[in-house]
């Protein structure tokens, strides 16, 4: 399973990339706004750090505008993937861009039907949002199982990016279901390292070693 970092924070990307854990990065307008920097500068800097795909989202809502933005975004770096919203206009743009060889990541997916439509339109990636479904009383992980089942049944090559990840359970459940990628906020990725028994074990080893050396 591949891990993408869901952030526009360059320092955090550098930190986790140095550990060999970052296969790609996803951004969105909200994450860029949080950093308070120029959109294009941030994307270029991230692309220079990470070898894998870096998703940058369009702002236009019409297909013509999305395509125009996408063509500009891919000029920034070879690893830019254009993030497109799941709408009719978005799918029109995805269809055009896929024929031009421009990779796309269809975002804001909340049903298996939407994921299937995006794949048929030519999306390189689809991003089902699990946390937001959980927030409204639905089972976000059930959506992932549905999408994986449909894609597997038809040999669909579009990769599934589990998005809106809120906690480590989302990550491991996605891995168990065979999802291609989880895009993870850095605070959640930090939590994957931790287990109280690991901490206890380290403390015991150190205490035993100190006792041995002081005999």
Curated annotation (Swiss-Prot):
Enzyme class, spelled out: transferase
Chain's role: Transaldolase is important for the balance of metabolites in the pentose-phosphate pathway.
Domain of life per record: Archaea
Catalytic site: 83 (schiff-base intermediate with substrate)
Protein source organism: Methanococcus maripaludis (strain C7 / ATCC BAA-1331)
GO cellular component: cytoplasm
InterPro entries: Aldolase_TIM, TAL/FSA, Transaldolase_3B, Transaldolase_3B/F6P_aldolase, Transaldolase_AS, TSA/FSA_arc/bac
Cellular compartment(s): Cytoplasm
Pathway entry: Carbohydrate degradation; pentose phosphate pathway; D-glyceraldehyde 3-phosphate and beta-D-fructose 6-phosphate from D-ribose 5-phosphate and D-xylulose 5-phosphate (non-oxidative stage): step 2/3
Pfam families in UniProt: TAL_FSA (PF00923)
Gene Ontology molecular function: aldehyde-lyase activity; transaldolase activity
Similarity comment: family membership: Belongs to the transaldolase family. Type 3B subfamily.
Membrane-crossing residue ranges in chain numbering: none
GO terms for biological process, alphabetical: carbohydrate metabolic process; pentose-phosphate shunt
EC number: 2.2.1.2
Protein's gene: tal
Disulphide bond pairs: none
Alphabetic keyword roster: Cytoplasm, Pentose shunt, Schiff base, Transferase
Catalytic activity: D-sedoheptulose 7-phosphate + D-glyceraldehyde 3-phosphate = D-erythrose 4-phosphate + beta-D-fructose 6-phosphate
Designated name of the protein: Probable transaldolase
Major subcellular location class: cytoplasm
């Amino acid at each position: 399973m591949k891990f993408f970092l869901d952030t526009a924070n360059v320092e955090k990307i550098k930190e986790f990339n140095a550990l060999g854990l970052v296969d790609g990065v996803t951004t969105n307008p909200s994450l860029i706004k949080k950093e308070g920097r120029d959109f294009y500068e941030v994307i270029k800097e991230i692309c220079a750090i990470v070898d894998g795909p870096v998703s940058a989202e369009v702002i236009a809502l019409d297909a013509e505008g999305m395509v125009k933005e996408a063509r500009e975004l891919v000029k920034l770096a070879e690893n830019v993937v254009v993030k497109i919203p799941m709408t009719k206009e978005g799918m029109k743009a995805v269809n055009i861009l896929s024929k031009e060889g421009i990779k796309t990541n269809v975002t804001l997916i909340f049903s298996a039907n939407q994921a299937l439509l995006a794949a048929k339109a030519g999306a390189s990636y689809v991003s089902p949002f699990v946390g937001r479904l959980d927030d409204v009383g639905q089972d976000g992980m059930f959506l992932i199982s549905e999408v994986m089942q449909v894609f597997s049944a038809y040999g669909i090559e579009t990769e599934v990016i589990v998005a809106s990840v809120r906690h480590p359970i989302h990550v491991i459940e996605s891995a168990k279901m065979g999802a291609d990628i989880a895009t993870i906020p850095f605070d959640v990725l930090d939590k994957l390292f931790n287990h109280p028994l690991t901490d206890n074990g380290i403390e015991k080893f150190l205490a035993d070693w100190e006792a041995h050396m002081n005999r």
